[in-house]
């Protein structure tokens, strides 16, 4: 990629960085159901989500912001419908994935996720009781499964406790009285550039870009197989191409890369 031809860059001369959001964050990525489905299928290792497709996902983030406030605006909440092996919908199972976007370690993330869960379950209860009065008081009433996931872009190893109970005093002595769950961390750095390149899906290129935090990272990114980057970018829908450009531009600006050089780097993946 370092020797990308001038012709490729000229083809992409119409790209104007100032037209794009410079502070793109991960929510832009996970608002896209195609990228989200690839992430859930290929990077979480959760059997229940192994066959999730874009059409099985509904973004319900805005529904809960009225309850949770502006501090949660960067997070996404998805409702996922589970299908049978033959592709038919078995039923509308409410599997809500909470994907946090942390560039550094948040040691209180388990408690933050619990707040999400309580709001989601409370809203679900209210909705079901409107449909059928008193339904939540019945023995067979069940609340929806919530799968909490942290998408971590930072360089440091994630060292926060993965269980809610570990944030509460007397967690061992009084364990049976303490609510608990485990959240999953998917770190972009748990994969090498080679491993991501081999996955060859659109989310893998997102994660390759998200790994760029230093000039050394940028240099390593530009060594990634040009064939992989070109084919992944070239076959991506236009809305995903725009996401690539936005997140890459945002990262290059954080590295204080000059505008002209940043445009050329984007041209290396965007010259189609």
Regions found by a protein language model. Name each.
Residues 1-272:
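Elongated, amphipathic alpha-helical interaction scaffolds
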